[in-house]
Amino acid sequence: PADDYVEKRLDVSEFLIDHHDATFFVNIQGQSMVDVGLLPGDKVVVDRSKTPRMGDIVLAVVDQEFTIKIFDYGANKMPRLMPANSSGAYRPIYIRPDMQFEIFGVVTGSFRRFK
């Protein structure tokens, strides 16, 4: 029967948020992260308490502008922020010493509404 496939009620906050005091939501703008399923209008969950690791999707501030990208290190061991869009329309952001750079939080989830 269909009841066998119904899970318990889901508390969305409990599911999406690990640290309530350090978590907030950001709207996705642009298409630089579509290959990882982040589409314009989606909301991402950002946790400021998590330590960013290579390969994490992060919310970063680069020269006073926010961006969501994949945190990585280039061949020169300098940090870079990688887009996830195979169209070639977006380039990595290579962080130079003269740039203002801060990882503002780690993206831990996302969600969207259909209607």
Regions found by a protein language model. Name each.
Residues 1-12, 16-115:
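Acidic/glycine-rich C-terminal interaction modules and beta/coil loop segments
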